């Protein structure tokens, strides 16, 4: 049985807990969450040892999850979005000591879409690109981590300027722009 420590108890955290509850080979042993000001232990399990950390927390809580995994010397799976460049760099450094798996979206469909964007970008690099995403009203980051990943694929060579939203009289669109729009509702 794999004893999991879960950081983040929102929609994904609850889904992970529910999935683990029906499996005989894994158990969510501890749950840590963020109340807006501090990280607290929402559930303390009976197992003496943790064997993996799953982090689907708010980006402000991610440092605690990574620190916990490093202190326990156990693997960490990270699905938290909105991470800073420094936090991503810290994960890369941690990967020299423990297994780290990070993605802004673990959906197989998004993996395929990212591959298709990368391939299309090879042939359509001179086309005007606007990236527009729509999410539910409870989505906390805008643009989402998935949209940011797609944006980084579209601008791998850093030759384009990202323009977030447009308002008023903006003039002619530059050829080296990528428009980024996030809708919630």
Where are these regions (language model features)?
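C-terminal substrate-binding/catalytic lobe of Rossmann-fold NAD(P)-dependent oxidoreductases
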Residues: 3-7, 11-47, 125-185
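Structural motif
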Residues: 7, 56-57, 79-80, 103
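Short hydrophobic/aromatic-enriched beta-strand-loop microsegments
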Residues: 28-29, 73-80, 99-101
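Short, acidic/turn-prone active-site loops that include or flank metal/cofactor-
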Residues: 34-37, 81-84, 105-106
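Beta-loop-alpha module in the N-terminal Rossmann-like domain of NAD(P)-dependent dehydrogenases
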Residues: 49-71, 82-87
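Rossmann-fold NAD(P)-binding glycine/threonine-rich loop
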Residues: 67, 80-101, 111, 115-120
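Rossmann-fold dehydrogenase core element
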Residues: 75, 90-107, 124-132
